[in-house]
């Protein structure tokens, strides 16, 4: 009768010991390859880095402290940033300080806005709302300030009602704008139709705002005290004058756009040579028919014609508002202008209307104008 072999438990024990050792060796190899991948990026050997990731697709392109995207922004290495985004790097990945790649790009100043900040923002817009351990968002580092729909400040009853109405109006306008865009996208014949122009949209917005303000003024006339009636009428006249100037500037800008489109069409016709005799075409092309419908820097409806110094544009906007003696009315007027020229709002609303190669210059001017308006508002506190 043969006894059971005592080597069986020993073999099982050796197998169980080898398994974690093999797993640890695999993890160690992966970490070495990830370090090699980061060294290739730092040395500018992008082809080697891409080939290494193709041979070992399981590597984590966001591994390391700081992560590779943060290093590329800090070194102003635009090719490495483009390669990392193409390989699937996450712009929302945070380092040990809670910073995302957008935080790192924002700290590099205005020179890094076009090559680093805009590509990261286009890949992951939601990262704009991520705060680091200091409670800062990328927009706050750039000096944009918090969006007005997230500001938490104690105000009196009248200002609170106006802010609530402004947020409601903004939401309705955004919903209506999205609905208009969706209708034109679903319509097969949209090339033969003209969507609502910028001047018509601005006039409609000003008209609805004036009607709303007039209704609120009529409802509140019975409850307001006589000494405040004169100040209210004066503030109302200031608002009407500001709206009239805004509509006039929008009409002038629309006229300039039409002349610019006609001039570009004539230049294009001259490059193609004389055309056979036929009926003269319309000078204004349908929207979306060519690049002539997109804005350049001078086509943007700046507060001053052609743009210029941000401080001068901010001073022009303040000069159109109520006098300095009416602090409350002037603060409300400045809040309206800050919302209108906030970089996030401007980029969301007009990004598709601006030439791509002019986008960085336009957004730089809008950011500077927004910061100048913020300084004027801070001076009134």
Curated annotation (Swiss-Prot):
Q: What is this protein identified as?
A: NF-kappa-B inhibitor-like protein 1
Query: Region Disordered: which residues?
Result: 1-32, 129-166, 186-242, 257-294
One GO MF term on file is: transcription regulator inhibitor activity
Q: Give the location in the cell.
A: Nucleus
InterPro entries, per database record? Ankyrin_rpt-contain_sf, NFKBIL1
Residues in ANK repeats: 64-93, 97-133
Subunit arrangement? Interacts with CACTIN (via N-terminal domain); the interaction occurs in a pro-inflammatory-independent manner.
- From which domain of life does this come? Eukaryota
Biased-composition ranges, Basic and acidic residues, are: 204-228, 257-270
UniProt keyword annotation of Nucleus present: yes
Keywords, ordered alphabetically: ANK repeat, Nucleus, Phosphoprotein, Repeat
**Known Gene3D superfamilies for this protein?**
Ankyrin repeat-containing domain
Residue ranges with Acidic residues bias: 150-159
Q: Where is the composition biased (Polar residues)?
A: 14-26
Q: Name one GO cellular component term.
A: nucleoplasm
Q: What is one Gene Ontology biological process annotated in the Swiss-Prot or TrEMBL record? A: negative regulation of NF-kappaB transcription factor activity
Purpose of the protein: Involved in the regulation of innate immune response. Acts as negative regulator of Toll-like receptor and interferon-regulatory factor (IRF) signaling pathways. Contributes to the negative regulation of transcriptional activation of NF-kappa-B target genes in response to endogenous pro-inflammatory stimuli.
Q: Which positions carry Phosphoserine? A: 150
Specify whether Methyltransferase is a keyword of the entry.
Answer: no
């Amino acid at each position: 009768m043969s006894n059971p072999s005592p080597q069986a438990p020993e073999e099982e024990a050796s197998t169980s010991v080898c398994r974690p050792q093999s797993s640890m060796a695999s993890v160690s190899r992966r970490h070495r390859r990830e370090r090699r991948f980061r060294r290739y990026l730092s040395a500018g050997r992008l082809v080697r880095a891409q080939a290494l990731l193709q041979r070992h697709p399981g590597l984590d392109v966001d591994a390391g402290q700081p992560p590779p995207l943060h290093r590329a922004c800090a070194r102003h290495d635009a090719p490495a940033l483009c390669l990392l985004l193409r390989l699937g790097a996450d712009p929302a990945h945070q380092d040990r300080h809670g910073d995302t790649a957008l935080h790192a790009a924002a700290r590099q100043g205005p020179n890094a806005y076009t090559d680093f900040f805009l590509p990261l923002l286009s890949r992951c817009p939601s990262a704009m709302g991520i705060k680091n351990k200091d409670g800062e968002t990328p927009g706050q580092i750039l000096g944009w300030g918090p969006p007005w729909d997230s500001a938490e400040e104690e105000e009196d009853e009248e200002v609170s009602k106006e802010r609530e109405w402004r947020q409601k109006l903004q939401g309705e306008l955004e919903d209506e704008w999205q609905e208009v865009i969706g209708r034109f996208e679903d319509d097969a014949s949209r090339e033969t139709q003209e969507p609502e122009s910028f001047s018509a949209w601005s006039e409609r917005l000003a008209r609805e705002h004036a009607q709303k303000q007039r209704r609120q003024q009529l409802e509140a006339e019975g409850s307001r005290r006589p000494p405040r009636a004169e100040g209210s009428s004066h503030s109302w006249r200031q608002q009407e004058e500001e709206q009239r100037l805004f509509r006039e500037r929008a009409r002038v800008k629309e006229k300039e756009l039409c002349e610019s489109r006609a001039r570009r069409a004539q230049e294009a016709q001259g490059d193609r040579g004389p055309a056979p005799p036929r009926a003269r075409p319309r000078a204004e092309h349908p929207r979306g028919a060519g690049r002539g419908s997109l804005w350049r820097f001078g086509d943007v409806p700046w507060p001053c014609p052609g743009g210029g110094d941000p401080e001068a544009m901010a001073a022009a906007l303040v000069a159109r508002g109520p006098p300095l003696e009416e602090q409350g009315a002037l603060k409300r007027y400045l809040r309206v202008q800050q919302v209108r020229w906030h970089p996030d709002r401007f980029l969301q609303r007009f990004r598709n209307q601006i030439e791509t190669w002019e986008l960085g210059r336009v957004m730089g001017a809008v950011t500077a104008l927004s910061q100048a308006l913020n300084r004027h508002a801070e001076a009134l506190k």
